[in-house]
Amino acid sequence: MGVAKEGCMQHIPSIAFSSCNYDENADLTPLHDGVLKVVKMVLEKGLPEYTCLNVNFPALPPFKGFKGCRMTHGSWINEVDHRTHPHGYDYYWMVGEYRNDEPETTDTDQWAVNHGYIAITPTKIDVTDYDWLKNFEL
């Protein structure tokens, strides 16, 4: 999502695509048609200013279709592994697992992917909490 957000801030229609298939030899060919449909939609209809899309594919086809949904509330646990490169320098590798804080909720990207749908989540660059701001006093 980082690169998609950077593009979005430069007023470039941006989409991040991810697969839940983490096999380093995964055949991503089955994602081709879904990627093309989303790209075509964005090129034809555009996106609102400062909005980009996060598109997540289930690990394996067949895909049941597309679901527009919100992000799941949760967090990554055990997410970073400290390693040493063969040339001697330290680096950190993203590993971990995702803890879903709302596993019974059916309007989220996690639910959609777990149930065979391609999840499309529109995200905004502006993360200001306007509800909090309305009541701000010091």
Where are these regions (language model features)?
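Electrostatically charged, flexible surface regions
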Residues: 28-138
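Internal, conserved structured core segments that host functional sites
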Residues: 1-21
